[in-house]
């Protein structure tokens, strides 16, 4: 969840004006204590316990051995279409990075939105 904390607080990312939503297989009851302890206040935490969102955005193609998605970022445009998607835990990423530097995410999102 440190990624969410940093996205919420980084002024460079916030200047892009892109809302962030964190979606996890974990229930809200499982997510809430850590989110509260980390001070996550401006990023909605959603549960995808039935995998409907993961299936809709086809992120299960990068699922880890347990069947859970890895660490996927999806930028959805105003029309609901995927403008950019990147999974940082995919099998083709040997480092299976679970934290992506905010500067990298800011750069990729900036490119995708043309800023």
Regions found by a protein language model. Give the residues of each.
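Structural microenvironment flanking redox-active thiols in thiol-disulfide oxidoreductases
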Residues: 1-41, 52-53
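Short low-complexity, flexible loop/linker segments enriched in glycine and/or proline
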Residues: 36-38, 60, 102-105
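Solvent-exposed coil/turn segments that connect beta secondary-structure elements
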Residues: 26, 49-50, 78-79
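Structural micro-motif
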Residues: 40-44, 60-74
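Short, positively charged
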Residues: 47-59, 110-115
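Short, flexible helix/strand-to-coil boundary loops that buttress conserved ligand/catalytic motifs
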Residues: 35, 57-58, 86
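Thiol-/selenol-based redox modules, centered on thioredoxin-like
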Residues: 67-115
